[in-house]
Amino acid sequence: MHKNWNYSNKPLANLESLFKMLETNEERLTYLLKNKKNYFKTVPVIRKGKKRTTYKVVGELLKIHELIKQRIFSKISLPEYITGGRKGVSYIDDCKSHLNKSIIIQEDMKDFFPSIKQDLIAKAFQYYMNFSPEVSSLIANLSTLEGSLVQGTKLSTDIANLIFLEEEALISEEVGKLGGNYTRYVDDITISFESEVNNEDISKIKTMILSMALKSGVRLNRKKSRVLRNGQSKIVHGVKVIKEIRPTQKRKHNIRMCLFNLKKK
């Protein structure tokens, strides 16, 4: 497997190095962790007619999150097939990777952020960045609420991208051998091929994705698992990807509703 990611900063070997990076001290971080719930504010969101709870981080913990993003995550170079959480890259770029293809495979990860646990996050910092165990555990603790990632914080997508790096490289490599493209936009995985691929190879790829998800404590949403072939409507992120990129009527409606709600505010 070719390693297609890199962390360019020096590994954090001890807590003193972390305190310096975050412009704080042990006493302040101990206080923040004791009162962590007070720094996570719920933000209800209506998506596809369903109410979801997202979070925003406030106050001193927000500053800590911003510094972690600037001084740790900005130093990670990610492979191009990760399209969520990358500066200057959007879901449209993800769609373009799958334009005018014969076969599209789609997988969705259910309850994505809450399924990623604090212990796994700490192990990822140790493995991918070579941080010490105590540094890794502290960053993981600062980044989570009640032992899990939550949707909406500045760090959630960055951390989720970190979790899958090695497994994803293997999947992308396997897909590439078959002449296909692999992308992941946050919790949505899309794979496409220009020509026909046999069912055995498709089954192998789907098994690899399932294995990656299970190793990370994430479940796949079977209701959203699809294999789309020629003659079927091919839609990625609410966008038609046939001969050109076009939003579906449903996506147009959702955009109009968002604009309407913004004007009301």
What residues fall within each predicted segment?
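N-terminal low-complexity, intrinsically disordered segments
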Residues: L12, L18-E26, L67-I82, K110, ...
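Short acidic (Asp/Glu) and glycine-rich catalytic loops that position anionic groups and cofactors
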Residues: V45-K48, Q232-V239
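Active-site-proximal segment of RNA-dependent polymerases
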Residues: L61-Q106, D111
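Non-catalytic, polymerase-adjacent accessory regions of viral genome-replication enzymes
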Residues: M1-N38
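Conserved polymerase palm-domain catalytic core
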Residues: L32, S97-V186, T190-R229, K263-K265
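Short, conserved non-catalytic motifs in the polymerase core
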Residues: K41-H65, T83-K87, N141-A160
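A residue-level signal for conserved active-site and pocket-lining positions in enzyme catalytic cores
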Residues: I68, S156, G238
